[in-house]
Amino acid sequence: MLKNENMFWQWDKEIPPIVCQALIKRGLQLDIVDAEVGNNLDDDEGKVDHSVRNSKVGFFNADTDAWLFHLLWGYMLKANINAEWNFDIEGQQPPQFTTYEKDFFYDFHEDGTFHQDGMRKLSMTVILSNPTDYDGGEFVFENGEDEVFKNQGTIIVFPSFIRHRVNPVTKGIRYSLVNWFEGPAFK
């Protein structure tokens, strides 16, 4: 069982604004599509459902963006140790670039889906936008409504079974990175 103080691990304003802007620029060059929900053992194919999730996504490539994979892997390792989760992590999915325009959101959900190579155990969100560029769009945990994350460059790592959401954006555009780290099923 998780202690409440270890529900997540955070680095506030860790990624410099110039790097956040470069990631946004690179992200906008990716193949951007409507975000899907689902995609687990019972539902092999994800589906677009704007009543649950309304955002656009693209995925970084391990060949052209290897530095990003390595950077995020390092933060995951530190969080896994510092928060004392010590989860068995064996792999990393491609980082997802996410765009939330006006009225876009992602309702409460868990990331802990199963895949052929294992299950998602740790999730990471990196806030790329300057908070003055958008209104709404707060990243929040279901059991931690007092914790609101909006600062540019903030990295949040948490167990993938923790429910969380992105509130609707009411003005502007919010950009973020999401990454998942996998391992064998919990025992």
What name fits each language-model region?
Residues 1-155, 161-187:
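Fe(II)/2-oxoglutarate oxygenase catalytic core
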